[in-house]
């Protein structure tokens, strides 16, 4: 549904911090999104985390979920960063890690809108590998004008 060129229109992040490769499902009725991050051994963070046993840092899994949620928020508003608005990741609740994410894994990112108070948005997010949950959290984002 969204290739990397369209994703770059909705996220201000760039290499090495753009963590969404593809969006395959965007459901406005269910207010949800499904996106993918292909985890390659060539990711720069594997040089130090950990050289002999590479594991994707948990904070980057959280960031990937937040980026998917950000795309959903922009799409729900029919807006883009170029319009002068950004979403900042400001917190997480109910965070759980269940298994490590390794080079060669495909991270499935799912986010569902659960509420909004003024400029604060909440999303229920989870990340899966091979259909198994690896991380889940409620992600909070703040909508800010540039």
UniProtKB/Swiss-Prot annotation:
**Which residues fall in a coiled-coil region?**
none
Q: Which InterPro entries match?
A: FabA_FabZ, FabZ, HotDog_dom_sf
Could you tell me the Gene Ontology terms of the biological process aspect for this record? fatty acid biosynthetic process; lipid A biosynthetic process
* Record flagged with keyword DNA damage: no
Q: Which family does it belong to?
A: Belongs to the thioester dehydratase family. FabZ subfamily.
* Compartmental location: Cytoplasm
The protein in question is named: 3-hydroxyacyl-[acyl-carrier-protein] dehydratase FabZ
Keyword field contains Manganese: no
Q: Which residues form the active site?
A: 49
GO cellular component terms? cytoplasm; membrane
Report the source organism: Pseudomonas putida (strain W619)
